[in-house]
């Protein structure tokens, strides 16, 4: 198996500003439509709930597969149910290809795909310029950056002086 990693550095005096700069440098460019897709395996749903609540508090519309949408709705987070790739329209893929989505959070069970849906969703999202996260930790870091983005005034830092 070949793994690829892209590292990005944000330099600032404050953590939130450095994090914000790192996400911008990595090409994470949010928000446009404030619409996102969440597909979360059962074992990660409890950990993903606070993430969904924070995105909802930022004004994001959350689309989710049936199981994830039911879990979120049952726990006080409004989520719109959308069909999986192989089901009838509207599907998650329809939303991605329709350029309506800014972010996909796709968390498979222990990194294992039970179907090809996750791969198809991630591939098409990346090909159409949609940001994709596959880790709750990264989603939390992005949220920290987004929540403080309104107060961000990025300050240039001369790295030669560090």
Give the positions of each predicted feature.
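Peripheral docking tails and interdomain loops at the edges
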Residues: 83-84, 92-162
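Long, charged amphipathic helices and adjacent flexible linkers at domain junctions
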Residues: 15-43
């Amino acid at each position: 198996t070949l793994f690829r990693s892209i590292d990005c550095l944000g330099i600032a005096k404050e953590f939130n500003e450095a994090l914000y700069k790192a996400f911008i440098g990595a090409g994470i460019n949010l928000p446009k439509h404030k619409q996102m897709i969440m597909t979360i395996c059962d074992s990660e749903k409890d950990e993903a709930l606070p993430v969904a609540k924070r995105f909802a508090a930022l004004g994001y519309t959350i689309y989710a597969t049936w199981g994830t949408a039911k879990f979120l709705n049952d726990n006080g987070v409004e989520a719109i149910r959308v069909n999986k790739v192989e089901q009838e329209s509207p599907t998650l893929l329809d939303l991605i290809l329709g350029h309506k989505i800014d972010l996909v959070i796709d968390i498979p069970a222990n990194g294992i795909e039970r179907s090809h849906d996750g791969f198809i969703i991630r591939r098409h999202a990346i090909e159409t310029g949609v940001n994709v996260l596959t880790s709750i930790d990264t989603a939390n870091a992005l949220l920290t950056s987004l929540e403080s983005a309104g107060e961000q005034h990025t300050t240039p830092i001369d790295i030669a002086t560090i």
